[in-house]
Amino acid sequence: MDFESQLCIKVVLLLLPFFIIGIRLLWVLPAVNSPAMGSEKEKGLSQIPSELRGSNIMIFLGSGGHTGEMMRILANVDLNNFNRTWVTSSGDSTSILKCKKYEDERLTSGQNKSDYLVLHRARTVGESIISSVFSTVRSLISTIKHLYELPQFPSILLLNGPGTSVPLAYIIFLLKFLGLCKTRIIYIESLARVKQLSVSGLLILPITDRFIVQWKQLAVKYKRAEYYGILI
């Protein structure tokens, strides 16, 4: 075999893994496969619970106003038929109390159970960029560790920010890419975001199966966004 033929074979073998990875990424990436929704797909809040089908739902509570919005949204969703995994950030004892109160007041005891995970916070308010990089790495490690310890991966990941939700969402997406889970990622943008998405929303938008906004102009601007009115 001459030199040119050997070189061509080596180049093909070198590029083949990248080609396969690219095809796989296109196959699983919702931003490529999901149709644009836009503001014309308004079907009402009742359409949201239709996605919550599966044996386990993981709910991320982002602390402060994010937790408050999520709990008000969940007031319209019946979670009795699902195992529930509540995820909070380190130092956020208030969110833990709120989800436990939700469990006590709204959910009936039975065969479905609830678990609680505490992840290292990706970034604190006022933290420098350099410090936040290390915090994000610690958050990634913490997230991988806790997900590895789960008896099963969630069927649904429901989140609405802020920063700590990004490592969680991307690790779940990586597991989907590797074929280890089929988790559907649903992100609900904060009511405070009227004209622009949050940084967390922009980062998570490409990998979400559903991206829900609460202002119509956002659904017009971002074609994969779904609009059902104000949810809280």
From Swiss-Prot:
InterPro entries reported in the protein's UniProt record: Oligosacch_biosynth_Alg14 (IPR013969)
Biological-process GO terms, alphabetical: dolichol-linked oligosaccharide biosynthetic process
TM region positions: 11-31
Compartmental location: Endoplasmic reticulum membrane; Nucleus membrane
Keyword Flavoprotein included in the entry's annotation: no
Entry keywords, A to Z: Endoplasmic reticulum, Membrane, Nucleus, Transmembrane, Transmembrane helix
GO cellular component terms listed in the entry, alphabetical order: nuclear membrane; UDP-N-acetylglucosamine transferase complex
Topology in the lipid bilayer: Single-pass membrane protein
Coiled coil: none
GO molecular function (one): N-acetylglucosaminyldiphosphodolichol N-acetylglucosaminyltransferase activity
Topological region Lumenal: 1-10
Cytoplasmic side: 32-232
Pfam families referenced in this protein's UniProt entry, alphabetically: Alg14
Reported function: Involved in protein N-glycosylation. Essential for the second step of the dolichol-linked oligosaccharide pathway. Anchors the catalytic subunit ALG13 to the ER.
Assembly mode: Heterodimer with ALG13 to form a functional enzyme.
Family according to the record: Belongs to the ALG14 family.
Protein name: UDP-N-acetylglucosamine transferase subunit ALG14
Gene: ALG14
